[in-house]
Amino acid sequence: MNQSVPLRLSGVDHTARPTWKLRETIEFYRDTLGLPLVHTISARGWGPESHPDFLHFFFDSGNGSTIAFFYYLGEPRPQERPLMPPTPDDHVFDATHTAWLTDSAEQLLAWKDMLEAKGVEVSSTTQHEVIESIYFRDPNGYFIEITVKLRELQPLDARDAALTLEAAIMAEQIANDHAGQVREIDTVWQEKGRLLSGQCGIKCEGPGIFVPALVEFASVVDAARHNSEYRVSQPSPGYFLIESNEALEFNRRELGLKPAVWYGLFTGGLCGRIDTFDKDRVRIVEQ
């Protein structure tokens, strides 16, 4: 093996899924979405005797990548899924989805208008932390997303992502050591709060929250600064820490946050425990 050759992946070539609806899938991706059909493989099995004969067809999905489908000839269709709205009702099935990037908010709304004009049920726009999206389903029930970037990712995003996953792994290890499971994201947030407190050399017993110094969370920090009972510090270049001697309380509508951002509000880390958390109000108290 040539160790002098640097290894680098150059992007996603294609994604693939099975389909039991040949005509409908072709018409949806080629005609409704306007993706050119660029390649088809037809084969008698693929080695193992148990592998059925199949068609494997590819649509151009932009920037040199394709989206592909396997159509297995004569194979029984799995239990038919009922017609589902473009909302994540089946979290396991819907976790597998394709998201296409568009260039602007105007383009995103234009896609929504075009799809609805063709009879496709489309979700309302959903603002996440760094993207805004619409969702719909193909004839197989697969989730499809079209999204626009709200900002570019920064080094802090990568650092915060690594801390979140480190906290999740630690929380799972602690739970496994006690024959338990991590069932609530609060456990991960609390572990991340402990990690960040240790890295900053401080003791944060709560109620307190670490807030990444990112634009989507700026209204939380601003609201805390205007509350005389809250203390705002920056113990780390990438994080603010909001603390109080009493409970911390925030209102989603007053902060101007969309639901998808609101429900991930404590991704920076939590000191204490969440006493109340509904669609508009959160209250954090001492552990």
Regions found by a protein language model. Give the residues of each.
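Vicinal oxygen chelate
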Residues: M1-V5, G11-K21, F58-G62, P82-Q199
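Core segments of cupin and vicinal oxygen chelate
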Residues: P18-Y72
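Short acidic/glycine-enriched loop/turn segments that link adjacent beta-strands
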Residues: H51-D53, H128-E132, G238
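Short amphipathic alpha-helix segments
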Residues: A213-N227
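Short glycine-/aliphatic-rich beta-strand segments at the starts of folded cytosolic domains
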Residues: G198-F210
